[in-house]
């Protein structure tokens, strides 16, 4: 039987306060999302009462929200939330445990983090009228201490997120390689790592590769220079194996990935390793890859008739409403450790030359609804939304259905960033669809 699987999705939910009592756009947005039997998004905060120990690192800002914020998030109709992102471990193991506990209380499916790598990488299973759907969640942007570890016969695993590691390589001319070698010699920038390599604590360099300050450089054979990246084979294999295993019992597998990495110097292009990883997931049997991370839309690719959303941008973006920040944050910005969080956030804004809150694309996104039959996408439409950039502060940073003028701008932008994938988009009758 050829069953149709219906999926709707949103981008990153960075919610820090309750939804406004008079906020009405939750209704049309919920109505659109409820078309899907799988309704998914990335929860980009921990959920706690605010008493968990802060990690010594964060995903940029230490994030935790009250359980009431989770309740408001679910008003949109989501039945799956990914928790693998750069904020997963902002409040250490206790913060992760609290988040999972609150999701279980609300009976929300989740994936992407857990007590060990097995739990973090296993899919959530959602029951639909078309059968069971598996959702895997993974993240490429994290501090190394945040990734989950495997348990062994001798030791327990480590709580954390499902990691997608990657490697970078820079190709330069022989002349530039000589320049770097001279700089390394006079500065000693490679000294400690060279010593550790001699002692066996770091793997030997491959032939033809040199290191400078922890970055790998390869001498170009044809004079071209540039950067490349590739996904970690171990993490790819773990994910591919999970997809194939899930396909044995589920009607479809969806992969959610959170990635802040960029190709060059802007947030519009997916990094090389992310494209390679997404293709590997589809090749292994996944029906779609849904990305988030960089706070603005990236291109959409149809790979073997399966959609890859490289980044859906923001759904709720309330970073400036953080109410708790540890001493580490205040010290970073030269403030007294007892300073209020609002003042700490304002200090960061003061010293930025290109604030996220001044970029229109950060406030624009799309919500995809798509249908899958026999592993392929048979229908795809996008609801254009905007996050109230020009509204009063109390009404900003939450989603509204975009007006026609804004929707057309979103369609034009999406066409531009999707051009490398051969997809063009147009606004038609309240939706953004593939250009005929």
Q: What does each model-found stretch correspond to?
A:
Residues 1-436:
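Acidic, metal/ion-coordinating pockets
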């Amino acid at each position: 039987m050829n069953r149709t699987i219906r999926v709707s999705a949103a981008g990153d939910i960075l919610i820090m306060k309750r939804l406004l009592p008079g906020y009405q756009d939750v209704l049309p947005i919920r109505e659109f999302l409820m078309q899907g039997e799988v309704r998914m998004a990335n929860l980009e905060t921990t959920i706690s009462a605010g008493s968990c120990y802060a990690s010594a690192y964060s995903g940029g800002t230490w994030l935790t929200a009250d359980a009431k914020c989770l309740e408001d998030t679910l008003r949109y109709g989501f039945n799956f939330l990914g928790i693998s992102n750069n904020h997963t471990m902002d409040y250490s193991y206790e913060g992760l445990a609290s988040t999972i506990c609150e999701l279980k209380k609300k009976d929300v499916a989740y994936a992407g983090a857990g007590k060990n790598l097995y739990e973090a990488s296993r899919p959530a299973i959602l029951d639909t009228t078309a059968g069971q759907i598996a959702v895997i969640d993974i993240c490429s942007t994290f501090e190394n201490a945040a990734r989950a570890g495997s348990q062994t016969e001798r030791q327990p695993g480590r709580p954390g997120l499902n990691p997608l590691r990657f490697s970078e390589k820079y190709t330069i001319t022989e002349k530039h390689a000589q320049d770097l070698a001279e700089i390394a010699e006079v500065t000693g920038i490679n000294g400690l790592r060279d010593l550790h390599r001699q002692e066996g604590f770091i793997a030997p360099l491959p032939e033809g590769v040199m290191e400078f300050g922890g970055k790998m450089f390869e001498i170009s054979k044809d004079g071209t220079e540039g950067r490349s990246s590739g996904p970690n084979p171990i993490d790819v294999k773990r994910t591919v194996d999970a997809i194939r295993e899930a396909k044995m019992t589920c009607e479809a597998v969806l992969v959610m990935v959170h990635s802040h990495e960029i190709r060059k110097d802007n947030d519009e292009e997916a990094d090389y390793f992310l494209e390679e990883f997404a293709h590997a997931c589809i090749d292994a049997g996944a029906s779609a890859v849904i990305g988030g991370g960089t706070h603005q839309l990236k291109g959409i690719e149809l790979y073997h008739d399966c959609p890859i959303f490289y980044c859906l941008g923001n759904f709720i973006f309330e970073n400036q409403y953080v109410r708790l920040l540890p001493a580490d944050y205040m010290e970073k910005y030269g403030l007294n450790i007892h300073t209020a969080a609002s003042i700490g956030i304002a200090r960061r804004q003061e010293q930025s030359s290109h604030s996220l809150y001044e970029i229109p694309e950060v406030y624009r996104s799309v919500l995809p609804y798509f249908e899958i039959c026999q592993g392929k996408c048979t229908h795809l439409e996008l609801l254009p939304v905007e996050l109230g950039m020009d509204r009063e502060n109390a009404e900003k940073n939450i989603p509204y259905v975009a007006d026609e003028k804004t929707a057309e701008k979103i369609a034009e932008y999406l066409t531009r960033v999707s051009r490398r994938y051969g997809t063009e988009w147009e606004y038609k009758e309240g939706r953004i669809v593939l250009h005929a």
